[in-house]
């Protein structure tokens, strides 16, 4: 993927808080897919799976099971990636197969 060099450069600054792995592996449909369909490059951030196999999107998927520490780290990583993308002199290439321009209604 042409975006890998961007993410590799950006993650160097935040590896110590937990951003260590970059993967091109597809994991199925997630929230970012809608943005891709509109022609916007969007990427999926995956954290350790923890109890996903038993609780994710079930009645067991409740607020009490949230890890506040993980949410804080995720927020820092997402903010850093957004800031890095905004400040980078380059432009992240659009993913292959995406529309060249966002869809209009």
Give the predicted meaning of each segment.
Residues 1-55:
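Metal-dependent peptidase/peptidase-like ectodomains
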Residues 47, 52-105:
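His/Asp/Glu-rich mid-to-C-terminal helical/loop segments that flank catalytic regions of hydrolases
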């Amino acid at each position: 993927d042409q975006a890998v060099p961007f993410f590799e450069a950006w993650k160097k600054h935040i590896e110590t808080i937990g951003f260590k792995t970059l993967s091109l592996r597809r994991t199925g449909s997630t929230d970012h897919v809608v943005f891709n369909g509109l022609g916007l490059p969007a990427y999926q951030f995956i954290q350790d799976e923890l109890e996903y196999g038993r609780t994710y999107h079930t009645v067991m998927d409740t607020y009490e099971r949230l890890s506040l520490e993980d949410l804080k780290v995720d927020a820092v990583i997402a903010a850093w990636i957004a800031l890095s993308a905004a400040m980078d002199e380059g432009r992240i290439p659009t993913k292959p197969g995406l529309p060249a321009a966002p869809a209009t209604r």
